[in-house]
From Swiss-Prot:
Record-given protein name: Methionyl-tRNA formyltransferase
Stored InterPro entries: Fmt, Formyl_trans_C, Formyl_transf_N, Formyl_transf_N_sf, Formyl_transferase-like_C_sf, Met-tRNA-FMT_C, Met-tRNA-FMT_N
UniProt-recorded Gene Ontology molecular function terms: methionyl-tRNA formyltransferase activity
Organism placement in taxonomy: Bacteria, Bacillati, Actinomycetota, Actinomycetes, Propionibacteriales
Enzyme Commission number(s): 2.1.2.9
Length: 315
């Protein structure tokens, strides 16, 4: 089939590459975001999908919006059978949804209807979900509410971060798109989503990623993993922010000094090789932290430089 591919970040590139490699399909064009100005000299830099499209010899439609103008016209004149979306990051207006013969399909990284929205992986980990996955569904006007063609489920490990899980799904979920296109060619109808169990996964706001030291250790650990590596959970010590990048919840049988076991919420306790944070439930080990503008380092190394003592508390 003749395809339009819409995507922007690294996570979308494996699907684009797989579609180009499939002789049954022709990727006629890529829809992506305009080049971003980066660095001191504000040099334009293409996004990962635009760069991949250039390397693959595929024309790119770079548009801030496709509600009207050249981007809109380019899509309507493409004569596509299907448009495939993976992390495009822009809205598709209602009039364009019907332009491809078989509409638009989207690879979404959650088990719909759970976690509709822009940050499904992050929100799943932050909520403490034990599993998530990916699905391919038909785009409709309502947010991530269209019927589903294909679904896969993956466990969320106790140490898994959002970045690691997203990278995994970017590759393992790609076959779902190929299978969904096979379904479309075969005339298979997608399955409507359940009206029950709908949750929303809004973009991560800076206030969402501040560590609340009175929260339970598991809740803080979920937050840290859910927003790692970016934007990163943060806390404040002596008026200065620092990121907490890796944590570990203590397990039964972990031997810790009494000063660690009795740490109060917000209290930092450093041993020779470890750093712990008192929480609303039990101590949490801080495995990796990063002062703003500095490199990431182990919690113990950071504690030595920060001169942590028995009275040190986070705000």
């Amino acid at each position: 089939m003749r395809l339009l591919f819409a995507g922007t970040p690294d996570v979308a590139v494996p699907t684009l590459t797989a579609l180009v490699a499939d002789p049954r399909h022709e990727v006629a064009a890529v829809l992506t975001r305009p080049d971003a100005a980066v660095g001191r000299h504000r040099t334009p830099r293409p996004c990962p999908v635009a760069k991949a499209a250039e390397e693959l010899g595929i024309p790119a439609i770079k548009a801030t919006s496709v509600k009207s103008g050249e981007g809109h016209d380019a899509i309507t004149s493409l004569d596509a059978d299907v448009a495939v979306v993976v992390a495009y990051g822009g809205l598709i207006p209602a009039d364009l949804l019907a332009v491809p013969r078989h509409g638009w399909i989207n690879l979404h990284f959650s088990l719909l209807p759970r976690w509709r929205g822009a940050a499904p992986i992050q929100r799943a980990i932050m909520a403490g979900d034990e599993e998530t996955g990916a699905c391919v569904f038909q785009l409709v006007e309502s947010l991530d509410a269209g019927p589903v063609y294909r679904t896969m489920t993956v466990p969320i490990g106790p140490m898994t971060t959002a970045g690691e899980l997203l990278d995994e799904l970017a590759h393992t979920a790609t076959p779902l798109v190929i299978e969904a296109l096979e379904d479309i060619e075969a005339g298979v109808e997608p399955t409507p989503q359940s009206v029950e169990g709908v949750t929303i996964a809004p973009q991560i706001h800076p206030d969402d990623v501040r560590v609340t030291v009175t929260a339970a250790a598991q809740e803080i650990d979920n937050l840290v993993r859910g927003v790692s590596p970016t934007p990163g959970a943060w806390a404040e010590l002596d008026g200065k922010r620092f990121k907490i990048l890796r944590t570990r919840c203590l397990e039964a049988g972990d031997g810790v000094p009494s000063t660690v076991a009795t740490a109060q919420p917000g209290q930092l306790v450093a041993t020779r090789k470890q750093l712990f944070l008192g929480t609303g439930s039990q101590p949490l080990e801080l495995l990796q932290v990063q002062a703003f503008g500095k490199r990431a380092m182990s919690g113990a190394d950071w504690a030595r430089g920060a001169d942590i003592d028995a009275g040190t508390r986070l705000r």
